[in-house]
Swiss-Prot record:
Its main location: secreted. InterPro entries: Pectin_lyas_fold, Pectin_lyase_fold/virulence, Pectinesterase_Asp_AS, Pectinesterase_cat. Gene3D superfamilies: Single-stranded right-handed beta-helix, Pectin lyase-like. Belongs to the pectinesterase family. Its EC number is 3.1.1.11. This is Pectinesterase A. It comes from the Eukaryota.
Amino acid sequence: MRVQSYLSLFSLVGAALCAPREHFKRTARTSAPAGCLTVGGSGTYSTIGAAFAALGSSSSEACIYISAGTYKEQLTFQYAGPLTLYGETTDTSSYKKNTVTITHTISSPEAGSLVASATVNAAMDNFTMYNINVVNGYGKGAQAVALAASGERQGYYGCQFLGYQDTLYARVGVQYYSNCYIEGAVDYIFGDASAWFGECDIVSNGAGYITAMSRETASDPAWYCFDHCNIYGKSGLDLTGDVYLGRPWRVLARVIYQNSELSDIINAAGWTTMAEGATPLYYEIGNTGDGADTSKRLYLSEISAAVTKATVLGSDWTDWLDWSY
């Protein structure tokens, strides 16, 4: 019996390592894609961490399917090969039917650093996540990261990221966020990754600043691009004029909002200061809504056309981005 169990485990892990990443959209994902390790429900593992540990030191492509539930875990993903996490959902095209939540509560001062406070620390290249909610439940009072994303070719599809201060640490690398929900109040999207946020809901749950980008040198190709996003306040809160599009964490922050809907939560000045001596590059083009008037904007630079995915994600973006989103 023990030998048979070992063989079964070997077969499961081997299948997960060989499984291809999904590049087509389904209306529902209520069972594991072929070859994935399984977590929760009737799956093999009870925790996400245990499933990830089972992948070991391989560099083969791998995937993990997570059944509906709330997983109280703090996770760091460092893996040599491409890794995809799938959450159970009845609608893969949106975050609204997500059933999987990963949650942890700790502040950066308590943890010792921003990254150490992250509920999910994706510290690898070729990391992809579908239809999973990531929460840092700390709330007001200190920085507390939900997702720390550090890597090339990272993709997040139909996910939710919830916190208050420093929710999403788009730290370094190249990242794509599609049809996601991102909630916070103070600097809740920050870092020096080059990141494209497409068709996302950017939701403020308090007065503050959406972005705190940390680009420092003119040679750094990084952008934060918000394309066809909806920018608004959390239901039940009156934040009229209380939210800024961003402030520069470092001196050459570069952010653009394009073809997006900006609600009345956006302060007429649009942008404000942070780093001493900063000369940020802040752009707006093609936006609509009560917060889109740029006539009183501060620190706004001119731009003649919306930026492209190639500009933000690099010339190889067509090779790794999930086209179904």
